[in-house]
């Protein structure tokens, strides 16, 4: 239990930790599956307003601007998400009962992904709002992140003042992810002609996809990212046929494509279409790979603090941001979407201290 001095400013970390932990326990107890986050948003909005801050709301997204907001200064966004996935099978505890053990482990659905980030960033925001910085702050607790929903951060960003940099809270063990893989899902269809399997009839649609599936398995895009590695393509679903004795006239398969920052999703799609004969449709081009330069002053500060920049294979709301961002938060990615999800209270304490050290006195480029 200690006070922490950053650039001659004393921060009461124990009080901030106590507040953060209390809010997290309350959030765990409120089910907030993607697209059903209303009660969690209500709670968080009420909590922020009780701290004397005005809030904005659109759907189940809650945000708050620092006092004395000055459009001549750059603006820093602190963002994490309040929605969770459904509880997977295998939970031995009630996912919606926050259970804290003597070793400081706090169990609950969304504790790690991304409740700990939501509450750590909120306490840091409230503290920094009481100080003078060279930037404005916006705190945003967004919804629908786990489903990349249209009602999440994407619909809020146009309502906010221009943002110049973002910290996105996701479990990274407080290491800074300076690049993140994007996602594009393709639905691919081949058409044939139905016929009876016993006779030499029809045109088998399954045979038509074989070459294309082999191409997806074997093709390597030329540009490899030093942080994210190559573009990864995986055929993950296939569907054809109605019964054993009918030649299928249609075969569809799904391709999961994880992009690196060397290509836009549109560029990948254009290249793919040159090589395959089946009809391909992209579900969306919007979940792009993201990348921030290692020379960015915030990244440089993180490195000076002993943090190690890395490339993240998992998708977050960073994909929907048009400005530079850093993904960094308490907890471990490997605990997300697992039974008996947990966070250590000590990880929240560490996160609050590291966020303050990173952001108090920071410079953000316009």
Q: Residue locations for each model-derived region?
A:
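Short, small-residue-biased leader/transition segments that mark boundaries at the very start
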Residues: 1-6
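Acidic/histidine-rich catalytic neighborhood of metal-dependent amide-processing enzymes
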Residues: 114-185, 189, 366
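Metal-dependent amide/peptide-bond hydrolase catalytic core
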Residues: 7, 15, 178, 185-366
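Active-site metal-coordination/substrate-binding segment of hydrolases
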Residues: 73-138
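N-terminal helical capping/dimerization or prosegment-like subdomains
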Residues: 7-87, 250-254, 268-271, 345-349, ...
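Short glycine/proline-enriched coil/turn segments at helix->beta-strand junctions
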Residues: 49-54, 58-60, 72-73, 128-134, ...
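Hydrophobic/aromatic beta-strand patches that form the interior of the parallel beta-sheet core
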Residues: 76-78, 140, 165-167, 326-328
């Amino acid at each position: 239990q200690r006070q922490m001095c950053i650039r001659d400013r004393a921060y009461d970390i124990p009080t901030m930790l106590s507040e953060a932990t209390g809010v997290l326990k309350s959030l765990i107890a409120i089910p907030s599956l993607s697209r059903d986050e209303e009660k969690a948003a209500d709670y968080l909005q009420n909590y922020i307003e009780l701290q004397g801050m005005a809030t904005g709301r659109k759907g189940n997204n809650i945000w708050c601007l620092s006092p004395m907001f000055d459009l001549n200064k750059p603006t820093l966004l602190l963002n994490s998400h309040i929605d969770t996935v459904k509880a997977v099978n295998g939970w031995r505890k009630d996912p919606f009962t926050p259970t804290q053990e003597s070793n400081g482990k706090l169990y609950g659905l969304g504790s790690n992904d991304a409740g700990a980030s939501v509450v750590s960033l909120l306490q840091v925001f409230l503290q920094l709002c009481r100080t003078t910085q060279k930037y404005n702050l916006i705190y945003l607790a967004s919804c629908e992140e786990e489903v990349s929903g249209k009602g999440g951060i994407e619909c809020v960003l146009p309502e906010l003042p221009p943002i110049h940099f973002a910290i996105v809270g996701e479990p990274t063990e407080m290491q800074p992810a300076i690049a993140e893989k994007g996602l594009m899902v393709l639905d691919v269809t081949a058409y044939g002609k139905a016929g009876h399997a016993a006779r030499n009839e029809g045109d088998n649609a399954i045979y038509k996809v074989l070459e294309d599936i082999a191409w997806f398995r074997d093709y390597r895009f030329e540009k490899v990212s030093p942080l994210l590695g190559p573009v990864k393509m995986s055929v993950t679903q296939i569907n054809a046929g109605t019964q054993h004795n009918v030649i299928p006239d249609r075969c569809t398969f799904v391709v999961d494509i994880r992009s690196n920052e060397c290509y836009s999703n549109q560029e990948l799609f254009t290249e793919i279409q040159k090589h395959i004969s089946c009809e391909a449709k992209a579900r969306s081009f919007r979940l792009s790979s993201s990348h921030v330069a290692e020379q960015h002053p915030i990244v440089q500060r993180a490195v000076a603090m002993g943090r190690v920049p890395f490339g993240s294979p998992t998708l977050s709301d960073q994909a929907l941001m048009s400005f530079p961002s850093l993904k960094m938060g308490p907890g471990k990615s490997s605990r997300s979407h697992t039974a008996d999800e947990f966070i250590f209270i000590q990880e929240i304490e560490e996160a609050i201290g590291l966020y303050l050290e990173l952001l108090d006195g920071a410079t953000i480029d316009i």
